[in-house]
């Protein structure tokens, strides 16, 4: 996202994925059409009403994952779910705070917003997760495969036990 838009706050689309890989391919002067994808991070920034950390307490356990609250001196800053095998990780955090702490650019339209980031990190075994022989770069922006990725991202969130009947709307 930062490579294409100059910041890591704007939500990335399927078209952005294609454009980013085309730009990378042009920059490196090599074709990435046969490149194998070995890691995938799927994320979205939700504009929420309250500070993002206030939502963490509504997210309970996730079967076969360790639930870890990332703590700082000001309280809970992030929520991590790491699979027992450490092949997958679900992460929730305040995207504006994270960007500001890294001293990265926050576009004016996002300043003073509550952006809750939900990120699914697939560290390996991507082809097994999606039941394909190989995941290549062009598959990431193929409409059917892209929709499978998004559906998987949603399904992983839905497996989290919700507490106090509150749920983040991920239907967009």
Outline where the language-model segments fall.
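Structured, helix-rich domain cores that form ligand/interaction pockets
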Residues: 1-171
């Amino acid at each position: 996202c930062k490579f294409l838009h100059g910041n890591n706050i704007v939500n990335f689309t399927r078209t952005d994925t294609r454009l980013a890989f085309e730009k990378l391919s042009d920059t490196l002067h090599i074709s990435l059409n046969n490149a194998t994808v070995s890691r995938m991070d799927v994320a979205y920034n939700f504009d929420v009403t309250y500070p993002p950390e206030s939502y963490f307490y509504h997210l309970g356990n996730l079967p076969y994952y360790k639930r870890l609250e990332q703590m700082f001196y000001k309280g809970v800053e992030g929520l991590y779910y790491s699979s027992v095998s450490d092949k997958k990780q679900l992460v929730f955090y305040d995207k504006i705070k994270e960007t500001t702490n890294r001293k990265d650019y926050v576009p004016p339209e996002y300043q003073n917003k509550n952006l809750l980031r939900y990120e699914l990190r697939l560290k390996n075994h991507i082809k097994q997760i999606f039941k394909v022989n190989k995941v290549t770069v062009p598959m990431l922006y193929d409409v059917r495969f892209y929709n499978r990725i998004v559906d998987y991202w949603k399904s992983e969130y839905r497996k989290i036990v919700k507490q106090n009947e509150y749920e983040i709307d991920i239907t967009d």
